């Protein structure tokens, strides 16, 4: 059965989603989870784009050994040099070069003739191949390119040393029939095509990214590029979990397989959703909250008699536990440590102690601690390594239907002093945020506020996501707590601390903070 390589670009193309700005610890945590998922290649970022991206790509390349790590580069020498410096310590250093090949891109964006584009592509591939054993070359906007020209430039870059050829549907324009024909055309018209692997990369502007990816595989693609939860620029990218499960469930049709560990899919999806702040829709295939829910009485009756009547995917296949209660207030440290290690924890003893303390605090308030609860507590610790300049000490809110909502907060300041302030608002959250703004003594513009429960039930943990403009920088923050108001305050301060850390990072490395 033909093996399909899975190329995950969550940390590069996925991070280009509007409002997503992952910090160093968050990128590392996602990369380690992608390794546990079994992806073949992790596109860790664009090393030449910023010092922050360079450092995170370098760290991921040095840490991750179970998956190959790659970075994006334009067809210019300085980008290739930056990629090499970031990736040379990787287990299998590889680079991802690109240049546009469609008439509209060549004329209006590149302002180059087709001949100049071929020359530039060949020059960059030769230079990259002198350092990297694996050179992937992408024809940006391939689906809107002239096929004879595309075949010509592909042959040229193969001769120059490319080992993987990627044909992206950059703007989500093509259809399954068209993309299959494109791959078949290249297989038939590029003399050296059998010397390389073919890759597909599809965007979801017309809602066909997954369908196009599967059609490309039928047309001869050996590698599929995708993101967790389908996140990405504009309408997003092809969804890794949907492609992976489709290839698994329909092996009879596609006659291919991947090396993914499917039971890690739900955990990976939840992690990416939490760290990016991009909520997974309830009706999302494979990982949505309703993916295995049956409302119709006829459907429920059928599932009770035989699950296969209406469930082609079992929850267990993708890591959705049917019995999610795992620990309680009387659980000991050994059982706790075993469970968090099962969930993928690889942190320090100090982090483990902090998670155990948070677990015990939660267990006093919540009778049943689920895997989702534990995973949320674990994530808070493993990606919370940034300096907290402002720390919430106490929070008290007075609320009543006929009263003025008032919040009183004590907070530890960067100086080490503890300050107290109070303010009112039309609602409890507004009162909290008005109080925090007074303590910060700086204007804050709240751009987005979202809340969701991590598990069901009235005692569920709350997860709050905010996006704000603070000191001219747009940052996001997250907060998790048993109480939604406490989670709201934590999310606010998390965003503030992230802004300060980003500015300090920029001062050290001389890189511009994007506004």
Swiss-Prot record:
Subcellular location, principal: cytoplasm
UniProt-annotated location(s): Cytoplasm
GO cellular component terms attached to this protein's record: cytoplasm
Residue ranges that the Swiss-Prot or TrEMBL entry lists as coiled coil: none
Cofactor: Mn(2+)
Residue numbers spanned by region Regulatory domain: 391-515
SUPFAM superfamilies attached to this UniProt entry: 2-isopropylmalate synthase LeuA, allosteric (dimerisation) domain, Aldolase
Catalytic activity, as annotated: 3-methyl-2-oxobutanoate + acetyl-CoA + H2O = (2S)-2-isopropylmalate + CoA + H(+)
Domain of life: Bacteria
CDD domains: DRE_TIM_IPMS (cd07940)
Example GO BP: L-leucine biosynthetic process
GO molecular function: 2-isopropylmalate synthase activity; acetyl-CoA C-acetyltransferase activity; manganese ion binding
PROSITE patterns xrefs: AIPM_HOMOCIT_SYNTH_1 (PS00815), AIPM_HOMOCIT_SYNTH_2 (PS00816), PYR_CT (PS50991)
InterPro entries according to UniProt: 2-IPM_HCS-like, 2-isopropylmalate_synth_dimer, AIPM/Hcit_synth_CS, Aldolase_TIM, LeuA/HCS_post-cat, LeuA_allosteric_dom_sf, LeuA_bact_synth, PYR_CT
Binding site for Mn(2+): 13, 201, 203, 237
Pathway the protein takes part in: Amino-acid biosynthesis; L-leucine biosynthesis; L-leucine from 3-methyl-2-oxobutanoate: step 1/4
Domain (Pyruvate carboxyltransferase) ranges: 4-266
Subunit details: Homodimer.
Similarity comment text for this entry: Belongs to the alpha-IPM synthase/homocitrate synthase family. LeuA type 1 subfamily.
Function: Catalyzes the condensation of the acetyl group of acetyl-CoA with 3-methyl-2-oxobutanoate (2-ketoisovalerate) to form 3-carboxy-3-hydroxy-4-methylpentanoate (2-isopropylmalate).
Protein's name according to its UniProt entry: 2-isopropylmalate synthase
Gene from which this protein is expressed: leuA
